[in-house]
Swiss-Prot record:
Keywords: Ribonucleoprotein, Ribosomal protein, RNA-binding, rRNA-binding. Signal peptide: none annotated. This is Large ribosomal subunit protein bL9. GO terms for cellular component: cytosolic large ribosomal subunit. The gene is rplI. It comes from Rhodopirellula baltica (strain DSM 10527 / NCIMB 13988 / SH1).
Amino acid sequence: MSKSATSHFKRLPKGQNGGIELLLIHNVEHLGRQGDLVEVKAGYALNYLLPQGLATIATDHHKRMVEKHREKLRAIELEKLKSYREQADELAKQSITIEANANDEGHLYGSVGPHEIVDALKASGITLAQDQIRLEGPLKELGLYTVKIHLHSEVDASLKVWVVPTVAAEGGEPGAS
């Protein structure tokens, strides 16, 4: 190694473990995501990350910027979490009714799944995605069910779902004389 390369290497900021502290400019598999502060061995930094433009030397200025950005993201995440918890409280107060064809014993001819629950919620003015509805299996009988709704990784809600028989048209059940 030449004298200038050695002196250049000595000027690089060292991390706590003797490696070089870098700020990732792009996501790097098995290392971190864009904006992460990472510590890597000098060879990895000098021969790959820096020449490829995947990272830059982490200065005190960069560290302050990253910390400010993380604080903003934490505040935004806390607001989202608060909003999801409020939505969960509202959903817990709600109940929806879904009509389905059933036999005399209360067994449904079909079943009620996430699609039907989302449609019933949409009719009530609540928009959710089908993958947020957590059922152990389709609902196949008449009755009251408590359905889990996944709003956020830290927030789940409960919703009461009534599955009731479809009201027959005038004259009673089809096929009745």
